[in-house]
């Protein structure tokens, strides 16, 4: 009896598990627990028979003085724990590294010329893994020095072949931060741990079943292969799981209303769905939505990574629609063209929410009335999950912007509040509607309405910050959102602001508006804690990331890009991290 192997865990495997758990804790969802638990179960169930065989045939052994004693199928409990902790650690590293990536946009329909290329890549991988299995089988048949290598390849090869065949598209298309990095980082770490363990004799490989080659001094080539293969299995398993989830949640025409914790059978159905059935327009819409958010709002782009998958997709599509609608109006050559765009969008919404019109009519109107670059944003709007009134109010907000052509429209703080409710409060309301769609709550209708109203107020607060930030930019396009009665009290006219938006009196009014923003924010922020738990942290990040702009404006220590105050990326990341860990 001894504690050498247990000490390996205490020193080298448990500390990374604690660190990774702490780092990922703010993001953990029920789905993540399900994914990790599912893979741990498979890892243990598939490894025990193989490892037991290695021990019973003398290929692998553990001196009695290094283990505590209890065994399962001849395997020391420390080794069984190793199966669990390795799978857990590698899975959490994968989850952390892949979190910023919106994976559904990496799905591919494999149509046209790309189809043959994808098939060749799939076949190349299959041939590679089949060759490894065949070589492993040959090593086992011949016995001797290649036995351990052969057993590794024959055991791991079929799993890798299966996972590759199911998820090769994701494995090849996703960034290396989602694929290679979560394989090689833990592999390199375990190579170092294994080197120390083999030198101390914590576990021993029989000399007649190994080649005697070393990757470096103290690390047997077979052990290096084992850790590379097992970490590849874990990451391939996570990728296959996420591939299935992406298919389930991206294509409602294939899977209507999938569960947030889908069964293994449903996951397999998703993986076996032919790529030719994927909807090109859906993937394009999501891809354009991600790029729009990345270009137009770095704060919300960072916050979007904290939202769970299906909700994240709908929020991206909602933002994309709002952004496109706003740009159509703002970029119009004159007021008549802008009014025409609003009329077309109103017609679009009437068609979408009409019970009598078929989808083909909606599609035709979009193709006839809107530029190709904007069509996917309209086609993919998650209208069935939203009530029509906030969208109609958003159009009223655009109409208020057009009224600037005739002169100032924001005469009092009440006018500014109404405007902000229409252009920002409405968006916040729709975000909350999407949250309650994906994560039903036990709250009654009245309580939900209170939360929606608070969301509307929070949208107003964010819009106040936006206006305070963009005083100079807005002046360049002939708009002043500061109330006229404020300007009068400060001894300024509307034209004074248009001509010189950086004068000292305006800086004072900016701070005054920010005070209003933070006052509204303080009254509304507690309602966030009544949202479903899956959305609380992400919504806090979205709000705090934007309110940080207000804090920087208050401090007057900010960078200016294109006439706007910006928050450095490092500070945005720190705000997001602090917010996620605050409650």
Swiss-Prot record:
Keywords: Carotenoid biosynthesis, Isomerase, Membrane, Multifunctional enzyme, Transferase, Transmembrane, Transmembrane helix
InterPro entries in the record: Isoprenoid_synthase_dom_sf, Lycopene_cyclase_dom, Squ/phyt_synthse, Squalene/phytoene_synthase_CS, Trans_IPPS_bact-type, Trans_IPPS_HH
Main location: membrane
Any one Gene Ontology cellular component term annotated for this protein: membrane
Membrane-spanning intervals of the chain: 3-23, 35-55, 75-97, 120-140, 151-171, 173-193, 221-241
GO terms classed as biological process: carotenoid biosynthetic process
Segments of this protein annotated with the region Phytoene synthase: 250-583
UniProt EC number: 5.5.1.19, 2.5.1.32
This protein's record includes keyword Transferase: yes
Family of this protein: In the N-terminal section; belongs to the lycopene beta-cyclase family. In the C-terminal section; belongs to the phytoene/squalene synthase family.
Protein name stated in the entry: Bifunctional lycopene cyclase/phytoene synthase
Organism field: Pyrenophora tritici-repentis (strain Pt-1C-BFP) (Wheat tan spot fungus)
């Amino acid at each position: 009896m001894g504690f050498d192997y247990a000490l390996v865990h205490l020193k080298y495997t448990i500390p990374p598990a604690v660190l990774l758990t702490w780092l990922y804790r703010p993001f953990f969802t029920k789905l993540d627990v399900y994914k990790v638990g599912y893979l741990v179960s498979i890892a243990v169930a598939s490894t025990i028979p193989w490892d037991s065989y290695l021990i019973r045939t003398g290929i692998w052994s553990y001196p009695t003085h290094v283990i505590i004693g209890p065994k399962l199928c001849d395997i020391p409990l420390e080794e069984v724990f190793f199966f669990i902790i390795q799978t857990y650690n590698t899975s959490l590293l994968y989850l952390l590294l892949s979190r910023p990536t919106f994976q559904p946009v990496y799905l591919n329909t494999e149509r046209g010329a790309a189809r043959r290329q994808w098939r060749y890549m799939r076949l190349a991988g299959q041939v590679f893994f089949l060759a490894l299995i065949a070589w492993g089988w040959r090593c086992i048949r011949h016995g001797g020095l290649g036995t351990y290598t052969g057993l590794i390849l024959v055991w791991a090869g079929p799993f890798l072949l299966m996972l590759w065949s199911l998820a090769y598209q994701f494995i090849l298309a996703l960034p290396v931060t989602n694929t290679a990095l979560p394989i090689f980082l833990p592999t390199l770490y375990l190579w170092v741990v294994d080197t120390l363990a083999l030198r101390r004799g914590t576990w021993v490989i029989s000399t007649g079943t190994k080649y005697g080659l070393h990757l470096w001094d103290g690390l047997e080539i077979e052990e290096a292969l084992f850790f590379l293969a097992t970490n590849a299995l874990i990451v391939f398993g996570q990728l296959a799981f996420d591939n299935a989830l992406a298919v389930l949640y991206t294509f409602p025409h294939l899977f209507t209303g999938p569960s947030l914790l889908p069964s293994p059978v449903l996951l397999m159905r998703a993986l076996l769905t032919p790529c030719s059935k994927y909807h090109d327009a859906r993937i394009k819409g999501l891809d354009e939505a991600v790029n729009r958010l990345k270009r137009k709002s770095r704060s919300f782009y960072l916050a979007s990574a904290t939202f769970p998958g299906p909700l994240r997709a709908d929020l991206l599509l909602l933002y994309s629609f709002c952004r496109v609608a706003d740009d159509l109006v703002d970029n119009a050559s004159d007021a008549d063209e802008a009014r025409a765009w609003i009329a077309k969008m109103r017609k679009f919404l009437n068609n979408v929410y009409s019970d009598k019109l078929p989808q083909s009519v909606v599609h035709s109107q979009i193709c006839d009335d809107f530029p190709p670059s904007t069509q996917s944003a309209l086609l993919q709007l998650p209208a069935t999950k939203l009530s029509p009134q906030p969208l109609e109010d958003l159009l009223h907000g655009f109409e208020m912007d057009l009224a600037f052509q005739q002169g100032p429209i924001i005469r009092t703080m009440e006018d500014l509040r109404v405007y902000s409710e229409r252009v920002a409060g409405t968006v916040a309301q729709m975000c909350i509607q999407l949250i309650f769609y994906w994560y039903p709550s036990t709250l009654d209708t009245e309580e939900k309405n209170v939360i929606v109203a608070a969301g509307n107020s929070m949208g107003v607060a964010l819009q106040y910050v936006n206006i305070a930030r963009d005083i100079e930019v807005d002046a360049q396009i002939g708009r002043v959102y500061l109330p006229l009665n404020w300007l009068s009290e400060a001894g300024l006219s509307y034209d004074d602001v248009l001509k010189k938006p950086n004068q000292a009196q305006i800086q004072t009014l900016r701070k005054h508006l920010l005070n209003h923003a933070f006052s509204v924010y303080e009254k509304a922020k507690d309602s966030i804690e009544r949202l479903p738990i899956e959305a609380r942290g992400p919504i806090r990040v979205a709000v705090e990331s934007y309110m940080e702009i207000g804090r920087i404006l208050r401090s007057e220590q900010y960078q200016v890009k294109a006439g706007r105050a910006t928050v450095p990326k490092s500070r945005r990341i720190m705000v997001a991290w602090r917010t996620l860990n605050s409650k």
